Amino acid sequence: VNAARLRRTGAWLTVVGLTATSLGATLLVATGAASEAAERASSSVVQSVGGDSASTQAWSDPSLVGDRDPHDPDYAAFSRLEVTVSQTRNLSHQSVTVDWKGGRPTSAGQFSYDYLQIMQCWGDDSAGPTPDQCQWGAPNPGLNNLVGERTAQRGLKRGEDPQQAYDAAHLVPPPLTNPNLKAYTVPFTPVGGSPVTDVADYFTSASTNEITAARTGTDGTGTANMEIQTSLEAPHLGCGEALASGAPRSCWLVVVPRGETNANGTLAEQSPGGSVVGSPLSATAWSHRMVFPLQFAAIGSSCALGNAEQRLVGDELFSDAMTSWQSALCGTGTTYGYSQIGDDEARSQLTSTVSGASRLAVVNAPLDPAPDEPVRYAPVVQTALVIAYTIDRQYKLGSSLSERDGTALDDLVLNPRLVAKLLTQSYRADVPGGGSGKPLIDNPRSIVNDPEFIALNPELEQFVHTAGPDGLMVGLGTSDAYAQLWRWVIADPFARAFLQGEPDEYGMTVNPVYADLDLTHDPNLDSFPKADLSTYRQDDSVPAPGYGTLDLRPYTNDMADAASRTQKANAGAKIVWDVNKLPPGFTSSGAQLPGSRFSMALTDLASAQRYGLRTARLVNAAGQALAADDDTMQAAVDAMVTVDGVRVTDADTRVRGAYPLTLVDYAAVPVCSASADQRSDYATFLRYAGSTGQVPGESKGALPRGYLPLGASQRDDLTAVADLLDDPKAVAKLCPPAATATPTASPSPTPTATAAATPDPTPTSTPSAPAAAPGSQDPGSDPAPVPVPTTPSEPTSASTPAPDPDTGESTAGDPIRTGGTDVGTARLGLVGSTGLGAACAVAGPVLMRRARVQALREGELETDFS
């Protein structure tokens, strides 16, 4: 072949190749979008199991408590009141949200009039409970100065209520020192018990769930989170315990609105203190009640005795899902138990030689080092770590926002450096004695006094200067989820510089105790040290050494406990010296008071939603302040990188619209060391987890709130593991008889990112620091401008360019039919044509170059090839 022919052939192949490649790539992108749209459309039509059990009642509706008296002095105040309870069926130990509208605004400051009182009651009568069946009368002692006389109690004052009976049934047994004393109360009758006048044997201010006073705003609306207790938390109510019929006992949520008129017709302003008086259990106040029936899920296991048992272990992120699935899995003939343990311990069980060790562990990160035998990872749930909060607006005197004083704050923004400050006791209020020594004396008292926090949350600039949380509540122990939080913090250059001792632009420095820990260089950091050993005592009456960090800022038992404490606004600090205690010691001051609560905790999204908590918007590496929801978690999952068979978040990657603390939990199974029975049971479990277990809903067996259902490709991965476990031939091929494995597990690795998408044009070394301005923000839009602090001197290390989610590759799952067209088959053909075009595009220039060489040899080089 002469040079001219080679040149012509090469040119022709180049043109054909470039054309075919461009056309094929364009069509691949188009069909990829169609495939993704089909997958999203498929998932969007899934119906929730159990349906919506929210219940709304109008006070004027006579269907439950009968007709209201239009001549009642409070009729006008309550006639437009409408209350909604967010969930009334399939209840467990959780919170429900009570919202209302049409009320009159609560008096400013104290709860003098026009507020709601909420309680939980038992009662088997279909008409609802009687006052003696309600858990009421053990308020926080600090509330006595905020409400009227007896409004927080069960006690009655003779003659105060014309409709109330003052008889022997309501008489309090007189003390021996005054046998003629006549005092009255509404007794409490526990389920299955006799009436008592002293409730202390059944509930106290520390255990009750009663809401003494809930504020109505100037617009007539209000909201409150009500803890719902089962028979496990409140045996005296018996909610959810099995009746003789086998059905779980139902209970009631009762709302008693308080107006501006006392039971005897006098106005509240004429009472001592200008407040409405009298117990909500007295006859007149009780006649104003609204009752909501509550249906509970059965308490305890419903699996039949004699079932085969399989013990599963894993982390806390999976606990809520497994609790929901367990009873539904009983029908498989196997009882699946679940032990919540640390991730490292769960991984170690997979390779343990101890009898009874589980061969299925739910973890967030793979075994490291990888064992000799094959371990398969099946995605089971995806959720997020969140910072949940209960914060009441506490405005300064004269604030322009004072009309909302005492209502719930509904937006909070935190960036990595603020979280670093909270985790390192760098605010003076988080150190015993208030950090009176150098250098902490120059730091803000609490996060509310931090200019960086105010820049992100300008509304809180009008809070009183004494407002602030009892620290950021965190759990004891280690967790892969905690490691992910630290990676998010340390990946931020401003937070990293702060932890290394650099002051922020306002002069605040890290607590030096934590600077000495060198947290930024600890690759295995997966817990929250409380390293400041300072102690404090108020005076000489308190024995040395006084109280310490663990008294002031105690750990929570786990993330669920953290959520529960946040809902109650009770961190459990024990810093009040009680000389009457035997022996004398530090005690808790109890929960924060309504209207002045400021509580924050690190927890999981499922627990936060179970307890009805708001969650902070966290600043991601792209500079956006985002809350955890289905969209932001999905964006994070789509951008995850693969590490040894699992997908994890790369904290250095800048992904727009992605919530930074999104996590995927995997069921890890060492295929060869699991027995045949175990593999079969694990396969059954995984198939349930990948099908019915991914349908969101309230019913047992559904996917609880706080979890993002698995995508199609993830369900395919899960099914592949289940199929392997159920295939003896595949197992035999994977596990030759000669193979042995006795490895040990050790802490999970720090993930190494792999190229997953087209690099983001914005360098990753640009700090995210004080991030997106508060306010609602579209995850797909650029963040609003925010104050940028002075760049720290050290943290500018280069990192790998991050993928841009707008142009990055998408992971393809199995073909999905849409509109009657097999998109997968079409894509396969396009892949082939694109590949052929690429080959032509490569071969063409090669032939042209060869023609040039041959022409040189022949002495026929033409000028257009020079």
Stretches found by the model and what they are:
Residues N2-A37, W100, S833-R849:
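Secretory targeting and sorting signals
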Residues L6-T9, R857-E862:
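Short helical patches
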Residues R7, W12, V16-T19, G24, ...:
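A detector of low-complexity, intrinsically disordered, Ser/Thr/Gly/Pro/Ala-rich segments
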Residues G32-S42, V853-E858:
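Ser/Thr/Pro/Gly-rich low-complexity linker/stalk segments immediately outside membranes or between
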Residues S42-D69, P73-A753, A769-P789, E794, ...:
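Flexible loop/hinge segments at secondary-structure junctions
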